[in-house]
Structure formats: C-alpha cells, structure tokens
C-alpha cells in the first residue's frame, strides 16, 4: 500500500497543481473519484493487465467509461498514466488529490467510532471541539461499535486516537502482562 502511494504521489501532486492553476479543483476531484471507481472494477483491472492491448488503447477504453466526452487535460492525464503503466494507481491518486484539497481548504475528514449513537447536538459539540483543536473545518463520519464499551476512537489518515474503554482495558492488560 505504501509503495502504491509513493508511486502515485508525483502524479497526484502534478494533477493537483494543474487543477489549481485552472481553478478546476472540484471538477478534477469529481473526475478522479469516478476514474478511481472505474480503475477498481475487476473487469477494468483485467483489461489494464492485458498485454495484448497497447497503452494508448487502454487509455481510450478507460476514457470510454465516462458518460461525457473528457476534457483534453483529463484525456492527456489518462494517456500519461497509461504510457507509464500507472492507470491502476488511480484510486491512490484520487485519495492523495483529496488530501491535497483538504489541506488547501483547511479541512479534515474524521471517522469517529462510538459505543452508542450520538445525537445531533453531541455530534455538533464534537465537531466544534475538534475544529477548534485542529484549527480546521471538520467533516465527521460516525459509526457505532458496541464492543468499544464506552468512549470513542477517532481516525483521520494515519492518525488513530483510541479513547475507548476497550482500548484502555487492552493497554492496562499489556502493562500488567509485562
């Protein structure tokens, strides 16, 4: 996974810079998200792995998956990826693009696992507290995991903050066991 991200990073950075220059970050974000879904499809993976197809043909077939004619810049980007045998990296490129966009917009996407459903008021208080602490606009996604017993687990990117009762019990058990 880290290797794929390393390979995808220069492409994501280049396309993000180009999108900024064109004032088209939102359009590129949407196009890359769709392209990432297409690239993740098993049939498409099989086509991309077919050694009997030229890289140009693979890019053309890939472009045909879009409902509308592609802007020339996106078509050229797909062709560059195809020529470098990197079309399969589109999910990673899209994810990195979204991280660059979030950084630009000073926003962060957090996933919160809780032991019980949070009310709208509790969610808003959590968003306000995290926004103040992180100095960013917070987009919150919550899931319920009753095995946590209580507390929360906060995830964003590579950062995980485990403030759950289950996590605290596990840390105590490790400390007592050593």
UniProtKB/Swiss-Prot annotation:
Its cellular-component GO annotations read: plasma membrane; proton-transporting ATP synthase complex
Q: Does the keyword Ion transport apply?
A: yes
Q: What does this protein do?
A: F(1)F(0) ATP synthase produces ATP from ADP in the presence of a proton or sodium gradient. F-type ATPases consist of two structural domains, F(1) containing the extramembraneous catalytic core and F(0) containing the membrane proton channel, linked together by a central stalk and a peripheral stalk. During catalysis, ATP synthesis in the catalytic domain of F(1) is coupled via a rotary mechanism of the central stalk subunits to proton translocation.
Task: Give the quaternary structure.
Answer: F-type ATPases have 2 components, F(1) - the catalytic core - and F(0) - the membrane proton channel. F(1) has five subunits: alpha(3), beta(3), gamma(1), delta(1), epsilon(1). F(0) has three main subunits: a(1), b(2) and c(10-14). The alpha and beta chains form an alternating ring which encloses part of the gamma chain. F(1) is attached to F(0) by a central stalk formed by the gamma and epsilon chains, while a peripheral stalk is formed by the delta and b chains.
- In its UniProt entry, what is this protein called? ATP synthase subunit delta
Query: Keyword annotations for this protein?
Result: ATP synthesis, Cell inner membrane, Cell membrane, CF(1), Hydrogen ion transport, Ion transport, Membrane, Transport
Asked whether the UniProt record includes Transport among its keywords, one would answer yes
The subcellular localization recorded is: Cell inner membrane
Q: Can you tell me which family this protein belongs to?
A: Belongs to the ATPase delta chain family.
Question: What's its membrane topology?
Answer: Peripheral membrane protein
Annotated GO molecular function terms are: proton-transporting ATP synthase activity, rotational mechanism
Superkingdom: Bacteria
Extract the InterPro entries matched here: ATP_synth_OSCP/delta_N_sf, ATPase_OSCP/d_CS, ATPase_OSCP/dsu
